[in-house]
Amino acid sequence: MTQEERFEQRIAQETAIEPQDWMPDAYRKTLIRQIGQHAHSEIVGMLPEGNWITRAPTLRRKAILLAKVQDEAGHGLYLYSAAETLGCAREDIYQKMLDGRMKYSSIFNYPTLSWADIGVIGWLVDGAAIVNQVALCRTSYGPYARAMVKICKEESFHQRQGFEACMALAQGSEAQKQMLQDAINRFWWPALMMFGPNDDNSPNSARSLTWKIKRFTNDELRQRFVDNTVPQVEMLGMTVPDPDLHFDTESGHYRFGEIDWQEFNEVINGRGICNQERLDAKRKAWEEGTWVREAALAHAQKQHARKVA
């Protein structure tokens, strides 16, 4: 049996692929791309929420948001570590993101204009992430799957926190209710775009499904999110900004309108509202953090020298 046949057999038998196992170069490259983009999304995703830490309406909300942003940083580090098991350096893939050669989730290129946006990000954006990431707990690459188990537990808390914040607004004044509806109007369609292009326009999906890196198609995950979320919107007394949305009794699913794929392509190609601002912020943080990285490396080298001596 060849190495490739043994690899295919492990995939078919649902046996996790580990870093020391042989794997095709294309499998390795696909994972580096996906895990790297996932890690970048966690790190860039700190920015729109961090923007509201000092402006949160209460001390409780401030503490919750601060903890959430810290969690996102941790998720990024887990994922960079998982990517490193594939033989890449985190500095290299991070620099590719700063240079615009690797992408992150399009949702983080939209501004957070009100406090309601923060609640809606926790509820809708993290809710969409959970739908995608729960399936990744069974991805074929072991380190990625294990990282996702911990991340999904924390993301579930984030989603509940976001929904609770939205519920408080939905039970508030007319101005608060309108602020919540405005936030839903802004983030509903970008949340649907998070699952990526339609299946017939997704060049990487087929191979990822064959290798069980992905377990479901983009459209299957998007449909699951809509089915989960529309009843929650209605429970809050809000409206989904989609005149074509309706429940199909025959299929048991909600049917929704056409996504603006031109907007999606503009954003992922660097022409969104906040693309440049997000990358500028990350470049600034990287440059200003040089002394921290150098100090940490020097400390590690001293510790190693003491052990050797």
UniProtKB/Swiss-Prot annotation:
Its cofactor is Fe cation. GO terms for molecular function: phenylacetyl-CoA 1,2-epoxidase activity. Its EC number is 1.14.13.149. GO terms for biological process: phenylacetate catabolic process. SUPFAM superfamilies: Ferritin-like. It is an enzyme of class 1 (oxidoreductase). Induction: Activated by cAMP receptor protein (CRP), integration host factor (IHF) and by phenylacetyl-coenzyme A (PA-CoA) that prevents PaaX from binding its target sequences. Inhibited by PaaX. GO terms for cellular component: cytosol; phenylacetyl-CoA 1,2-epoxidase complex. Pathway: Aromatic compound metabolism; phenylacetate degradation. Keywords: NADP, Oxidoreductase. Substrate binds at R33, Q37, K103, Y104, S105, S106, N132, M193, S202, P203, N204, K214, N218. It holds the Pfam family PaaA_PaaC. It catalyses: phenylacetyl-CoA + NADPH + O2 + H(+) = 2-(1,2-epoxy-1,2-dihydrophenyl)acetyl-CoA + NADP(+) + H2O. InterPro entries: Aromatic_CoA_ox/epox, Ferritin-like, Ferritin-like_SF, PaaA, PaaA_PaaC. Component of 1,2-phenylacetyl-CoA epoxidase multicomponent enzyme system which catalyzes the reduction of phenylacetyl-CoA (PA-CoA) to form 1,2-epoxyphenylacetyl-CoA. The subunit A is the catalytic subunit involved in the incorporation of one atom of molecular oxygen into phenylacetyl-CoA. Forms a stable heterotetramer (dimer of heterodimers) with PaaC. This is 1,2-phenylacetyl-CoA epoxidase, subunit A. It comes from Escherichia coli (strain K12).
